[in-house]
Each structure stands twice: as structure tokens, then as C-alpha cells.
């Protein structure tokens, strides 16, 4: 199998001052192209360290994606490191210099002399175009390894990988068929509980079951070679059966997007009233394009379940909304949820059995509970569901 690695560069990445989203994106993107990364490294803005690791990985990797260090400043050292590792100099790429000058001229700006550095490439480098920025990429062959050097700006990096680097890899190597990856996301059951229930399943050859916990959800993944797809799809039915009512969606689209689509398909508008969740519901649903009407975030206050239910019923009527969803304030370890619908208003009072989790996590969990309440009603299910450390202690229904 082709050995593909990634090298992230930059002091800010090494020291944790920024999150390396490029590495996460590349690992996921290449995995679905049948090119799983075998190693990832990070090095700071130090020429000797860069040269050392380029020479080291050139003896082990078939392909190395180097990210960052192609800018115009003194700490952008990737081109010089590549040239030094190869024992050659930098040469000016005249065509790219003219392209950069045009780029600045069209925007009514004068190109700084320091930008000239971005057109200086190792003598043996293959130029790689950057259609959305001033940092061109390049490729060099060092020992057994084909190295691609890419800009750190995420939008530029992704375009270059998708439209320049992947086609070159397909031309030069015989790439394997992408793996099959079946995913579902659960809410309300712990990772250990799910694993205990699923560990008895017999997996086909080369197939693995993976778990990813990201509070408040657990993602289950069944991954394997394309040759085992039929067996995997049969096994997937058992996985879904075991996960049961805790499954909130399949695939990677996300619950807000699926709810948004269902609301649009059924021509339901939605109004929100949030206290404890502080606008998380509105943020998540608006990003997914949900048909929202008036959304409010109000100060937390103690309410009975009946008060919350009557308030959201009135709010739905006042805003002529199809649906209305409320999350009350968090008082004395208790919280209310209420959903007003054409069929009536359904309300739940819950109790937190632990307070060891941070405020942010508790807000995320409650936002997910509210979304799941809405999902379950849209699917014709009982709206009540529990989380491991949240107990439903009271329910109420108001007739239309």
C-alpha cells in the first residue's frame, strides 16, 4: 500500500496556538480516496529541524504532504528547507512572479518586495498552481518520496489538494479502491455501554468497528474494504438494531441539517425560546438553513413545567409558527423542555444527576436533547428520551 504522510509546519501549530484543521481535513479527505495517512508530524519554524525531517521521511514515505511555510515572511522556510534537503538552490519562477503582480494590481494594491520570495522555488521543483492565493505550491522528489508543498491557508490548501495534488497522485500511482465507511450517531447511551453490546458481533475480514465520543454524542463507524461491502451492509442492520432508539442520524450530515430538511419538506416554520442553552439551538439550526421565525434568548428564571408549556404554546400562536420549541432556565439541577405543535404541546422536566461537567458541555447536551425531542416528534415517536446523567422526572401534554 502507498505510504502517505503529512508534515505540518509552523510554531503556532507546534505550540498549540492554532488548531491544525488542515491535518484533520486532509486525513479525512485522503481516507475517503483510499489513501489513509500512515503518519503525521509537526515541526516549528526552524530550518535545521525542517531539513532533518524532510530527509528522514524521504527514506520512509512514498508521498509527503508538507503544509505551511510558503508565505512572504522570514519565518516561512519550506521552500528553502526543500532546496537545502535536496542540495540545490532556489530559482525565481518568473511566470508566478508575474501572476502575483497581476493579482495585486487587479485589487488596486502594490505588491510588497517581500512577496517576491513566494516565487522562489527549489531548482528541480514542479510548479503547482494556486488559483485562489499568492502562495504557489510545488513538488520535489527526494529519495523514494514525492513531496508536495502547500500553503497553510485552509481555503487555498483544500483547493490545491483537490484540484492539483490528487489528480497528480492518480496519474503517477495505482490507487486502491476507497474503503467503505458506514456511520451513525447516537445520543443518550455511553460509549462503554454501546461497545459492550456490539463487541459480540462477528466482523468480516478486514472490517473494524470504531467509536468516537464527542460530548454529547457517540459516533459508530464500520469501516472495511470495498470487497466486503455486501457483508458490511448486512452487519450494519444488526448495529442499528443494537443501537436502537439512541440513533439520531446516519451518515455525516448532522442532526440540525436533517431536521432543517424535514421542516422544509413538511412546510413547518419554527420559533425558539432559549434560556439555559443561550442561543445554541438558534445557531445550529440557522447554520443548517432551518425555516426559523422569531428566536429569543432570555435571562434564566425558575419556571414550573406548566409555565414553560403554556408560554411556548402562546409563543407559537403569537408568531403564527408551525412549531415552537423552548428550553427553560437551569434552576436547582432542574430544566424544562417544551415543544408546541399542531397536535398539542409536549413538555418534559429533567434533573441533572451530576454537576461535574462544565457549563459548555451541559449546554451542548441540553441543546441536543431539545433537537432530539423535535426529531422524535417529526418521526412520530414519543418525545421523551434520556441521557446517561439526565433523568426525565415529569411530563405534560396540553391539548390543542
Curated annotation (Swiss-Prot):
Disulfide cross-links: none
Highest rank taxon of the organism: Bacteria
Alphabetized InterPro entries for the sequence: CinA, CinA-like_C, Competence-induced_CinA, MoaB/Mog-like_dom_sf, MoaB/Mog_dom
Family recorded in the similarity comment: Belongs to the CinA family.
Protein name (record): CinA-like protein
Amino acid at each position: 500500500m502507498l505510504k502517505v504522510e503529512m508534515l505540518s509546519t509552523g510554531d503556532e501549530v507546534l505550540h498549540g496556538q492554532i488548531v491544525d484543521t488542515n491535518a484533520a481535513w486532509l486525513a479525512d479527505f485522503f481516507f475517503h480516496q483510499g489513501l489513509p495517512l500512515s503518519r503525521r508530524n509537526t515541526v516549528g519554524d526552524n530550518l535545521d529541524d525542517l531539513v532533518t525531517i524532510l530527509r528522514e521521511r524521504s527514506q520512509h514515505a512514498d508521498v509527503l504532504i508538507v503544509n505551511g511555510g510558503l508565505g512572504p515572511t522570514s519565518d516561512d522556510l519550506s521552500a528553502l528547507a526543500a532546496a537545502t534537503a535536496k542540495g540545490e538552490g532556489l530559482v525565481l519562477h518568473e511566470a508566478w512572479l508575474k501572476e502575483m503582480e497581476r493579482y495585486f494590481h487587479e485589487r488596486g494594491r502594490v505588491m510588497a518586495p517581500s512577496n517576491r520570495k513566494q516565487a522562489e522555488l527549489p531548482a528541480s521543483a514542479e510548479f503547482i498552481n494556486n488559483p485562489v492565493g499568492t502562495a504557489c505550491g510545488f513538488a520535489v522528489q527526494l529519495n523514494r518520496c514525492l513531496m508536495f508543498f502547500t500553503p497553510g491557508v485552509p481555503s487555498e490548501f483544500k483547493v490545491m489538494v483537490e484540484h492539483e495534488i490528487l489528480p497528480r497522485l492518480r496519474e503517477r500511482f495505482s490507487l486502491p479502491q476507497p474503503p467503505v465507511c458506514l456511520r451513525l450517531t447516537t445520543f443518550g447511551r455511553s460509549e462503554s455501554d454501546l461497545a459492550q453490546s456490539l463487541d459480540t458481533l462477528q466482523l468480516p475480514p478486514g472490517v473494524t468497528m470504531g467509536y468516537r465520543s464527542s460530548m454529547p454524542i457517540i459516533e459508530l463507524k464500520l469501516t472495511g474494504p470495498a470487497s466486503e461491502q455486501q457483508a458490511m451492509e448486512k452487519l450494519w442492520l444488526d448495529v442499528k438494531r443494537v443501537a436502537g432508539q439512541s440513533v439520531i442520524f446516519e451518515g455525516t450530515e448532522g442532526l440540525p441539517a436533517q431536521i432543517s430538511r424535514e421542516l422544509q419538506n413538511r412546510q413547518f416554520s419554527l420559533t425558539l425560546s432559549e434560556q439555559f442553552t443561550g442561543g445554541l439551538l438558534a445557531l445550529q439550526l440557522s447554520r443548517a438553513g432551518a425555516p426559523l421565525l422569531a428566536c429569543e434568548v432570555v435571562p434564566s428564571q425558575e419556571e414550573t413545567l406548566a409555565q414553560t408549556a403554556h408560554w411556548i404554546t402562546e409563543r407559537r400562536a403569537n408568531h403564527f409558527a408551525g412549531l415552537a420549541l423552548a428550553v427553560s432556565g437551569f434552576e436547582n439541577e432542574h430544566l424544562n423542555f417544551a415543544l408546541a405543535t399542531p397536535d398539542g404541546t409536549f413538555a418534559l422536566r429533567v434533573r441533572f444527576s451530576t454537576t461535574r461537567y462544565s457549563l459548555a458541555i451541559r449546554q451542548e447536551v441540553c441543546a441536543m436533547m431539545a433537537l432530539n425531542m423535535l426529531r422524535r416528534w417529526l418521526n412520530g415517536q414519543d418525545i421523551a428520551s434520556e441521557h446517561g446523567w439526565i433523568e426525565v422526572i415529569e411530563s405534560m401534554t396540553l391539548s390543542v
